Regions:
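Membrane-proximal extracellular/periplasmic loop immediately following the first transmembrane helix
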Residues: 45-97, 107-109
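Alpha-helical transmembrane segments
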Residues: 14, 27-53
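Mechanotransmission and gating elements of multispan inner-membrane complexes involved in transport
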Residues: 158-160, 167-240
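N-terminal Sec/SRP start-transfer signal
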Residues: 1-29, 353-354
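Hydrophobic secondary-structure segments that place a key small or acidic residue at a functional site
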Residues: 91, 104-114, 121-184
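Short helix-loop junctions at transmembrane helix boundaries
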Residues: 278-279, 285-331, 335-352
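Short helix-to-coil transition segments within interhelical loops
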Residues: 8, 265-274, 353
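Peri-transmembrane interface segments
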Residues: 208-261, 265-266, 277-281, 285-286
Length: 354
């Protein structure tokens, strides 16, 4: 430990440069991870936050909610097997509504399910859906579109007017805010091919016969654009981590080669290989931890100045995960240098410098 920290102190510029590179790389990893998670949440938070672990969709829907059409008989089949409280059918469609007395239009995803079920949205402002057929509860992000509680929006199919009575939170679908309506009104606002249920949300682990049951992850992966967005950003993150490991490895390898004579002297006076190897690992750990701490501070600062509509979400578990990954790749990056330290011969190293 003493040797590692003393060397860091003596060679501030050398280690400062690699530290700066590590800060930039870890900062990029955190930013892209935040964007990936934010896009994921912006695309599918309504499904992610459902208190359901499985879904029943139509066999021919390719696991896509917007394609799925489930008949009432199929719903009864599932409900009879698991119970009414554990199986809740719901409908989904996307549409463009227009604000009353305004030319302002807003894209929305319309959800409809039974009242007082586990799919009912939690209200953060205003009131929950009542029995009236002209009310809607919307995700609070709709305020960015100029729609607030008390405003009226018009359905393009039925020309029916709906008043926003409450806001919920974290309810997005396909990058559009979700609005909730009563089941009774669905028939008037849907096209002829949209009358059936889209899916059945299950809050049970029972085996269900004569039904196409999939888990939540499969539903998320089938939302338009979800898999493609996440795949692209995950690949970028993976490349950044590989680049970080290579840079750390090359840096410490070059440093170790430059210190061959000093390492030989240390070995000649009785310093053990384990002590020298430990010093190298401590340096890598110190730099990676400092780099991650600085990166986290920078990312949190960036998060404060990002526009409200920017899909950015970085949770504490995610940060902890990347801190652990970065520490691991820092240690892996020193492996080739550790081998170089172990194979240094004291006599050859000292003699080579004479």
């Amino acid at each position: 430990m003493f040797l590692a920290l003393r060397e860091l102190k003596q060679s501030k510029l050398r280690y400062g440069l690699i530290g700066l590179i590590m800060v930039l790389l870890s900062f990029l990893v955190l930013v892209i991870s935040g964007l990936a998670n934010g896009l994921s949440y912006d695309n599918a938070s309504s499904i992610q936050n459902m208190e359901a672990n499985k879904f029943v969709l139509a066999d021919d829907a390719e696991n896509k909610l917007l394609r799925s059409q489930i008949k009432k008989d199929d719903v009864d089949n599932v409900v009879n097997q698991v119970g009414e409280k554990e199986a809740v059918p719901f409908r989904v469609k996307v549409s463009t509504y227009e604000k009353k007395d305004s030319s302002k239009k807003v894209d929305v995803a319309i959800f409809s399910s039974e009242r007082d079920s586990f799919l009912e949205p939690k209200i953060v402002k205003g009131e929950k859906l009542g029995t009236a057929n002209n009310e809607m509860v919307a995700d609070e992000s709709i305020k960015e579109k100029g729609i607030d509680i008390g405003d009226t929006i018009i359905d393009p199919v039925s020309k029916k007017e709906f008043t926003i009575v409450g806001f919920t939170k974290d309810q997005m679908f396909s990058h559009t805010p979700v609005v909730y309506v009563n089941e009774d009104v669905w028939g008037s606002i849907s096209q002829p091919n949209q009358k059936d249920y889209s899916a059945i949300a299950l809050n049970a682990d029972k085996e269900i016969k004569n039904a196409h049951v999939i888990d939540k992850k499969e539903v998320l992966q089938s939302i338009p654009g979800f898999k493609e967005e996440q795949g692209t950003l995950t690949m970028i993150i993976a490349f950044l981590l590989v680049i970080a490991a290579l840079l750390i490895g090359v840096f410490f390898y070059v440093i170790t080669l430059q210190k061959t004579q000093q390492l030989g002297v240390l070995k000649a006076i009785g310093t053990k290989n384990s002590y020298l190897a430990n010093s190298l690992v401590v340096q890598a750990l110190f730099l990676s931890v400092v780099a991650m701490v600085i990166s986290i501070v920078l990312v949190q600062g960036l998060e404060q100045i990002l526009p409200a509509g920017m899909p950015f979400l970085l949770t504490t578990p995610m940060i902890a995960q990347y801190v652990a990954i970065f520490i691991v790749i820092s240690i892996l990056g020193t492996l080739i240098s550790l081998y170089q330290v172990l194979k240094v011969d004291a006599l050859e190293a000292i003699g080579g410098g004479m």
